Structure formats: C-alpha cells, structure tokens
C-alpha cells in the first residue's frame, strides 16, 4: 500500500474514532446529569416533600441542560427510546445506536450512584425508582408510558429537524418532558426514558416492575418514529439505502442540523454525516 494512502486511511480512522468517542462521552455525560438532577428532585425530604410542579420544572431544566450540552456532539439523545426512534427512522446505524445506549445506561448508573452517595440514608432509600401508583394496572402503566414517550419523541424529531424549525431544541424538548411529568407522575412516576429508570434501579436493586419502563417507552418511540418519518414528513430513502444506513456503510441524511446555516445561502446542497 502506498505511504500516502496509508496516511489518509490513518487520518480517516483517527478522525472517525475521535468523533465517535466524543459522541459517546456526550451521551454518557448528558444522561448522567439528567438522572442526577431529575431524580434528585423527587427525593422525599422529610421537611419538604417535592410537588408535582417542582419535579416537572426540574426535569424540564435537566433536559434542556442535557440537550444543550450534547446536541452539537451526539445529537442529544440521552435516552434509549430516542436512539431507537432514530434507528427506526434510518437516521443512525445499528452499531452507533448500540454504543449510544450503552453509554446512556452507564451515564445513568453513574449519575444515580453519585446522587446516592451524596444523599442521607433515610432519603435515598428508594432513590426515585419508578413504580406504579394509585392502583394503576401494569397494562395501564405501559399504555401511559407509551403515550408520554410518543409525544416526547415526536417533539424531539420536530425540534431537531432543521426543515421544520429554527427554534431552540433544548427549550422545546424540555417543555415536552415537563408536560409528560405533569401527567405521568400520578401513574408511574413518569419515566419516558429507560435509562432514567435503569440507573436508580441498579443502585438500589429494585426491579419489581422495571420492564414497564422499557416496554412502554420503547414501543411509544417506535410508533412516534413511524408516524414522523413515514407519515408526517416522509423521506425518499429506498429499502437498499435504509439497509446500508442500518449497517453503517453509507452516509445518512441529517435530521439534526448540527451547524444550522441560513437556508437562503445554500444552493442545492444537503447536510450529511457519516453513519457508523
């Protein structure tokens, strides 16, 4: 192999690895901060139990912070349900999706562990683990989580899609998360994010109804992706192109506009990112 070709290959691999490692760290960090601050708001302090509005506002702000930190690096998923939705919509490859989810679960666990470590013993006993409340059945809990996550993922797609809006994704997605909490707290404590449920459950070892907070959100995310990408705003990718994107052998049209540009300054050009 020619030396010049070797150098180009080395630079390509090195640059690709740098981009991937930054994206994974961004997902790890964003999810960890989201869990630390969000779950921290539901802790049952004896002198002042948290109100539903307080929890909703805190999760709103935690979401906005996580999105603002990571959206230009990784796309600001910070949620396995969002990553699955992007995979179903052919906006991310399977290898990258698996790596993202692993980073998210690791970040959620570290965030929950940090919160557990700094919280007094009597307050941290349940660590905000999601459970079913108010005589809600498991079927009802799954349905609630499905609907809550469906509206969240639809908002994520619409907020991140540069074809639709130039507003702030952090503010809009944060508002969607707050909306979910204002309703969902009474049913399930409101997850909408399997990583948010996973981290605290790992630290305190409570998995009694943990499956609900995977089945509901992931199903809602898939439905939201199908609705947005195939009904509301369908694209023209062929089956072959979608399969190539799935395995990471082709370029992917960006739903997330990482570097927003004025549309009038572009002439027949499209933003793309390399799928991995």
Swiss-Prot record:
What does the UniProt record note about how this protein's activity is regulated?
Activated by mercury and pH-gated, anion permeability is observed at pH 5.5 and increases markedly at pH 4.0. Selectivity for chloride increases at low pH. The water channel activity is stimulated by mercury by opposition to other aquaporins.
Q: What happens after mutating residue 60 to G?
A: Increased water channel activity
Annotated PROSITE patterns: MIP
**Which chain regions cross the lipid bilayer?**
23-43, 52-70, 97-118, 139-159, 166-185, 211-231
Q: Name one Pfam family in it.
A: MIP
Sequence motif: NPA 1, positions: 79-81
| First-listed, main subcellular location of the protein, grouped into a coarse class | membrane
Glycosylation, residue list: 134
Cell location: Cytoplasmic vesicle membrane
Q: Which UniProt keywords apply?
A: Cytoplasmic vesicle, Glycoprotein, Membrane, Repeat, Transmembrane, Transmembrane helix, Transport
The record's InterPro entries line, in alphabetical order, gives: Aquaporin-like, Aquaporin_6, Aquaporin_transptr, MIP, MIP_CS
- GO aspect biological process, one term: renal water transport
Tissue and organ distribution: Kidney.
**Cytoplasmic topological segments:** 1-22, 71-75, 86-96, 160-165, 232-276
Q: Which GO terms describe its cellular component?
A: cytoplasmic vesicle membrane; transport vesicle membrane
Q: Which residues lie on this side of the membrane: Extracellular?
A: 44-51, 119-138, 186-189, 203-210
Gene3D superfamilies the record matches: Glycerol uptake facilitator protein
**Per the record, what about its domains?**
Aquaporins contain two tandem repeats each containing three membrane-spanning domains and a pore-forming loop with the signature motif Asn-Pro-Ala (NPA).
Self-association or partners: how does it assemble? Homotetramer; each monomer provides an independent solute pore.
Q: Which family does it belong to?
A: Belongs to the MIP/aquaporin (TC 1.A.8) family.
User: What is the protein's given name?
Assistant: Aquaporin-6
């Amino acid at each position: 192999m020619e030396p010049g070709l070797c150098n180009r290959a080395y630079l390509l691999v090195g640059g690709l690895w740098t981009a991937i490692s930054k994206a994974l760290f961004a997902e790890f960090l964003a999810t960890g901060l989201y869990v630390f601050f969000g779950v921290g708001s539901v802790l049952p302090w004896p002198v002042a139990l948290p109100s539903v509005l307080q929890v909703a506002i805190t999760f709103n702000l935690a979401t906005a912070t996580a999105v603002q930190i990571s959206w230009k690096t990784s796309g600001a998923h910070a949620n396995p349900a969002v990553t699955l939705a992007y995979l179903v919509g052919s906006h991310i490859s399977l290898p990258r999706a698996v790596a993202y989810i692993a980073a998210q679960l690791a970040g959620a666990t570290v965030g929950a562990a940090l919160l557990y470590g700094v919280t007094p013993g009597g307050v941290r006993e349940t660590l905000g683990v999601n459970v079913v409340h108010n005589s809600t059945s498991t079927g009802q809990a799954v349905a609630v989580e499905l609907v809550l996550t469906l509206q969240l993922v639809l908002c994520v797609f619409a907020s991140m899609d540069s074809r639709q809006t130039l507003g702030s994704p952090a503010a809009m997605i944060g508002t969607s998360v707050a909306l979910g909490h204002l309703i969902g707290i009474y049913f399930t404590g409101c997850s909408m994010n399997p990583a948010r449920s996973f981290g605290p459950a790992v630290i305190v070892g409570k998995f009694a109804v943990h499956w609900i907070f995977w089945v509901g959100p992931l199903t809602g995310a898939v439905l939201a992706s199908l609705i947005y990408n195939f009904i509301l705003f369908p694209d023209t990718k062929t089956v072959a192109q979608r399969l190539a994107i799935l395995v990471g052998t082709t370029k992917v049209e960006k739903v997330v506009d990482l570097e927003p540009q004025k549309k009038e300054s572009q002439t027949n050009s499209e933003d793309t990112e390399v799928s991995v």
